[in-house]
């Protein structure tokens, strides 16, 4: 127990230490201040702009920024769909894989282009190395950079600056942040035992005299951007539970830090943009405290173990079902909460085997989307709640709501409400449909309360662009591929459109001079109220689902049945 808690504590301390360093660096990149990579990257970026016809000094309006995102994402999706469809004709296919079904290709492309990386296939038996690295690997960089660009544009708008240029933000996000860190991280993973090869599967003879095929590939480079970009899609079906993706405690530590580094740093980046580091730290600690509570809930459940198993065996042991023993209960619980908090979606153990407390924590993260949140977009979601808090507190004291010196009016509240309503709509309605019809019900492997959790988790993971799943669900079917693709698209692009329109609206407003009655958003009291509103809205929206799923399952286990 002590060692497990020490591992969790050490990881969280490192997160706190690197947040201001990386947050300040990200701010310098997007404020176009000098960085250590300027001599190397400036010529490369200028060449990219010249070839693509981008004018770096041209700022975009909200709708221009939105159109740029939609057009580039559509183009990249069509390109990658074609590459996977024709993978049998392309190089780096030593295992001779053919063409997957059209619906699995569609779901995969939609999933990866949106930074969701929900996988209904096994990578080692479905996709060639070219499809994995050149196609999906390409989307891992661009989808992460797209989310990062949205977060930065949103921060710019709230702080009264122009939104910027999407193509510039996309390029700088890749060249200055994602690519350099991924290269360093991939080298570290190779040194620690993660394979990086274009050789085909190995054929070996087992001790019993049988034949076994061992899949391998260019895993290290794929793995690092998977974690750093909050992508989460694994090279292998077992994801980071596979010994080739995550062979030991050292690689697990690197991947855990990579997973949370940018979402945590983005809060500090806001503080630099707004010239209000105090508020950034208050928001950081608000999110951090809720995160630690959820880690404690999940870790306690795993440490106490399954009461039915322990009662039958007459021992008190942690829950080790679905765990890799090289990580144990503590690192698995921390990872499960972190991967759903950051919308990464990678797993180092099976979430389907989590105790109800752990399942509650992971679902809670997927429902709120702000406990760190996704790449860039998580920070934007956090400020949506901040805007609603200002609006509600303004109503209570009879003042016109203001934030960052700008009035919050009907348009902003309508857009903020739309952003928060999209997620429950594309989670709860498809879940109800899936639970009502025999065709979709056939994919559910657990008829009890856990079966409800399997369905809701699948759509919550899709809509929040997380991508993890309770893998007891048989999800590689036409229904699940198409329905989750729709949830992914709506859950990704409708909030992004509304966020950018809201930011554009705020950037155009005149600054209102501060008065003694102006609500200060950088106070402990206001931050506490924000946390309360976040939790209340989350509980009111999704508590019935939590009650029917993990809470009911916990009571059933406690009763001994």
Curated annotation (Swiss-Prot):
Output a single Gene Ontology CC term carried by this record: plasma membrane
Tell me how this protein sits in the membrane.
Multi-pass membrane protein
Tell me where in or outside the cell this protein is found. Answer: Cell membrane
> What sections of the sequence does the record tag as coiled-coil?
none
Query: Transmembrane ranges?
Result: 2-22, 65-85, 135-155, 177-197, 253-273, 280-300, 327-347, 353-373, 378-398, 413-433, 482-502, 531-551
Q: Carries keyword Repressor?
A: no
Where on the tree of life does the source sit, at the highest rank? Bacteria
Q: What is its main location?
A: membrane
The protein's GO terms of the molecular function aspect are: P-type potassium transmembrane transporter activity; potassium ion binding
| Alphabetical UniProt keywords | Cell membrane, Ion transport, Membrane, Potassium, Potassium transport, Transmembrane, Transmembrane helix, Transport
Entry-linked Pfam families = KdpA
Job of this protein: Part of the high-affinity ATP-driven potassium transport (or Kdp) system, which catalyzes the hydrolysis of ATP coupled with the electrogenic transport of potassium into the cytoplasm. This subunit binds the extracellular potassium ions and delivers the ions to the membrane domain of KdpB through an intramembrane tunnel.
Q: How does it assemble?
A: The system is composed of three essential subunits: KdpA, KdpB and KdpC.
Q: Which family does it belong to?
A: Belongs to the KdpA family.
- The entry's protein name is Potassium-transporting ATPase potassium-binding subunit
Origin species? Anabaena sp. (strain L31)
């Amino acid at each position: 127990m002590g060692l497990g808690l020490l591992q969790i504590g050490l990881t969280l301390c490192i997160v706190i230490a690197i947040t201001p360093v990386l947050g300040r660096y990200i701010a310098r990149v997007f404020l176009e201040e000098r960085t250590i990579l300027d001599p190397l990257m400036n010529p490369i970026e200028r060449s990219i702009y010249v070839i693509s016809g981008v004018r770096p000094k041209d700022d975009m309006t909200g709708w221009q920024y939105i159109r740029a995102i939609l057009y580039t994402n559509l183009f990249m999706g069509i390109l990658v769909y074609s590459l996977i469809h024709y993978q049998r004709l392309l190089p780096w296919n030593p295992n001779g894989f053919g063409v997957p079904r059209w619906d699995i290709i569609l779901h995969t492309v939609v999933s990866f282009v949106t930074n969701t990386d929900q996988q209904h296939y096994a990578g080692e038996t479905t996709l060639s190395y070219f499809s994995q690295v050149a196609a999906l690997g390409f989307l891992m960089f661009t989808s992460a950079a797209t989310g990062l660009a949205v977060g930065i544009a949103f921060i710019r708008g709230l702080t009264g600056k122009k939104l910027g240029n999407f193509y510039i933000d996309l390029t700088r996000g890749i060249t200055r942040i994602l690519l350099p860190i991924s290269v360093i991280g991939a080298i570290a993973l190779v040194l620690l035992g993660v394979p990086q090869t274009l050789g085909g599967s190995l054929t070996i003879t087992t001790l019993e005299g049988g034949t076994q095929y061992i899949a391998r590939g260019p895993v290290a480079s794929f793995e690092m951007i998977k974690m750093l970009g909050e992508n989460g899609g694994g090279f292998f079906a077992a994801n980071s539970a596979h010994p080739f993706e995550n062979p030991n405690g050292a690689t697990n530590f690197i991947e855990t830090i990579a997973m949370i580094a940018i979402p945590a740093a983005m809060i500090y980046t806001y503080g630099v943009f707004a010239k209000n580091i105090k508020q950034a730290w208050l928001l950081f600690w608000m999110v951090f405290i809720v995160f630690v509570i959820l880690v404690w809930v999940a870790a306690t459940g795993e440490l106490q173990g399954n009461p039915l198993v322990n009662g039958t065996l007459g021992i008190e042991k942690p829950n080790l079902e679905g765990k890799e023993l090289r990580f144990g209960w503590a690192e698995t619980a921390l990872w499960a909460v972190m991967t759903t908090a950051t919308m990464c979606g990678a797993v180092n153990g099976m979430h389907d085997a989590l105790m109800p407390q752990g399942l509650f924590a992971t679902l809670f993260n997927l429902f709120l989307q702000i406990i760190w949140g996704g790449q860039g977009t998580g920070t934007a979601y956090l400020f949506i709640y901040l805007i609603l808090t200002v609006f509600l507190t303004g109503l209570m004291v009879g003042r016109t709501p203001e934030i960052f010196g700008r009035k919050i009016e009907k348009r902003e509240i309508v857009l903020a409400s739309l952003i928060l309503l999209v997620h429950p709509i594309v989670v709860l309605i498809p879940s109800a449909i899936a639970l009502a019809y025999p065709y979709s019900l056939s994919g559910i492997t657990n008829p009890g309360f856990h079966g409800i959790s399997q369905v809701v988790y699948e759509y919550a993971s899709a809509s929040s662009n997380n991508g993890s799943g309770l893998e007891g669900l048989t999800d590689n079917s036409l229904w699940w591929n198409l329905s989750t693709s729709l949830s992914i698209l709506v859950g990704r692009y409708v909030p992004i459109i509304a966020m950018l329109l809201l930011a554009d609206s705020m950037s155009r407003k005149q600054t209102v001079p501060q008065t003694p009655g102006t609500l200060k958003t950088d106070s402990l009291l206001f931050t506490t109220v924000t946390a309360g509103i976040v939790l209340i809205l989350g509980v009111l929206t999704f508590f019935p689902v939590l009650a029917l799923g993990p809470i009911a399952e916990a009571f059933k286990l406690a009763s001994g049945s």
